[in-house]
Each structure stands twice: as structure tokens, then as C-alpha cells.
Amino acid sequence: IYNDIIPWDDDVDVFITRKQLAELQQILQDDETFHVTVVWDWYVPCKQIRFKLRDEKNPTFIDLFPLDTITGNYSEAWNITSQARVDFVSDIRKKFTGTEWEKTPYLYDNSALAEQIEYVLDEHYRALSEKINFTDDLQTASGLVRGIENIDETHSSGPYPIDDWMPTINMRFDDFDVPAPPAWRKYLQNLYGDFLQIPHDIDSHEHVDNHYLQDDAVLASLEKYVNS
């Protein structure tokens, strides 16, 4: 219904359960075309997870945002997890200010320092697991919560009761179907208000540096992929 345009954002963000993310990473481990990259972003701060082509000349990507599945009171779990995100950010700011991460704001996961950040994340998840009940079983899950390594929301879009999200429905986009939560309209309105309007700050976004799009090798890679 959008004529192949997503008017409420200028990139593609996809929620994915933590179990599905692990499965995707396993599937793509030896894939020659695609892979999943991980970069720790100091500015936000967050764990930037992207589905990308292995061709480094092709700058296109899809952002992946992990969701955790939980049982019990989903509203309470949402509030507890939201506070856990605040605590996690405070902790990593305290521990890593003045380190390589601050000096090199985009830190790839093959860095020794990234291992330390992952350790801190694991510590916070262990503490969180004592307060809410995580599950990998979507059949028994009562809700979803955003991973504490995700970017901050401008305002809270939750809680996420499972029936609003699962099972997914197919929605047509261009010439293919994509899975979407049954309550998709509710959450787009929560986040963006009138999501059919172009965001007022759209010109300030630059997910891909413009100089890439002037590079002949980049343009050739994009054309090759689109025509493949």
C-alpha cells in the first residue's frame, strides 16, 4: 500500500528474537553472499547488528534488533527490562570512558575490548534473568521485551504482549511478502504517530556516506546486486 516506499523511516529495521538471531548467524557462517556484522557504537551506545552482503563495496544493510521472549507479567517485564537498559548504559559508560571504544566509536566484535563489553552485557543479563523469566518457547511466551543492547527509544513503545506479535502475518511489499506482527499499525502509531508522513528530519539522516554513492566501484556493486 506504500508503493514500495517506507515513509516513516529511511532505513530498514527488523526485530528478531534472540534465538532466531543465533540461528541466522549459524546459517550464514559459511555463506558466500551474506553475513551478520556486529559493531559496538559508543555514541548511542548500542550493539549494532546488521545483515549485510560480504561484498565490502556494497554499503546496503538491514539493522537487526534482538527481542527476548518472556513468560509471566509482560508489562512488569517490560518495565524491569527498560530499567535494565538504563543500568547497562550507565555501567558501560563508567567502565569504558577513556578507552579505545570512546576513541574509536565504532568497535568491531573481533576487538579484545569488544569481548570485555560482551562480558558486561552477559553480567547484566544474568542479573536480569533473576527478575524476569526468559524462554525460547514461543508457544508458552506471554510477551516480548527489547534487548538491553538495543538503541534507546525516543519514547516507550511497549509493552509487547505476545498476541500482538505472534503469529506473524504476511504483508505484500513490491513483489514479495514479508512477515509482520498482526498489531503492526498500533506500534507504528506508538512510535511515529502519523507514519504515512515523511519524517521532518529525514534530510539529517545519512546511514550511508554520500561519497560512497559517487564511487564507481560501489555503483557497480549495487547494480550487480540489483540485477542478480
PLM features: what roles do these ranges have?
Residues L28-S82, G98-L191, I198-S228:
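Conserved catalytic core of two-metal-ion nucleotidyltransferases
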